[in-house]
Amino acid sequence: MSYACPILSTINICLPYLKDINMIDKRGETLLHKAVRYNKQSLVSLLLESGSDVNIRSNNGYTCIAIAINESRNIELLKMLLCHKPTLDCVIDSLREISNIVDNYYAIKQCIKYAMIIDDCTSSKIPESISQRYNDYIDLCNQELNEMKKIMVGGNTMFSLIFTDHGAKIIHRYANNPELREYYELKQNKIYVEAYDIISDAIVKHDRIHKTIESVDDNTYISNLPYTIKYKIFEQQ
């Protein structure tokens, strides 16, 4: 991998040998800050996968998220950072640092959308200038999330199945649940539309597990086990 910036090329070569991937320079910036600033998407991905902390603030209070919005103006970089689950404080601080709340409307909406998942009281923590301008969007986020929290699927809420680590591990088990199917088929969300992709993937996984179970030869040790046990065996694959 080659970069126009010599510093970044050196980082790429030395990365496997670094003792602390989150080391900071005299400006309080990490390698991740610099990779985001220089718009190096592949390097940002590598740093995140290697354990870079997305929550670290520089000496001037800048987060990587704020840099992605104000300097890089790169939505894909922003999405990568949000996928690595920054803290609510990090996101709120990043919103405070946004220099143009009009032109950066899409990036701001991405941050609000993520923050509302973490804490449904987020709206009270968002900078007033942003909360006033994006009030309708915040309300719609709340509406969709509250609806997910009301729907029970087995012993879980739709929200927990979609947005928690535990839910991600078990949602496929509920692929034929009538409440989940109805929610999926209605497709009423305008903001959290990724919920439908998650459910679709869960249905595909469930069907694959079921077909695998059906393909097991009769009169074998596994074939004689209860269906639920066989399901748990094959869902690990």
Swiss-Prot record:
PROSITE patterns: ANK_REP_REGION, ANK_REPEAT. Keywords: ANK repeat, Early protein, Repeat. The keyword Repeat applies. Gene3D superfamilies: Ankyrin repeat-containing domain. Signal peptide: none annotated. The keyword Amino-acid biosynthesis does not apply. ANK repeats lie at residues 27-56, 60-90. May be involved in virus-host protein interaction through the ankyrin repeats. PANTHER family: CYCLIN-DEPENDENT KINASE INHIBITOR 2C-RELATED, POLY [ADP-RIBOSE] POLYMERASE TANKYRASE. This is Ankyrin repeat protein 14. It comes from Vaccinia virus (strain Western Reserve) (VACV).
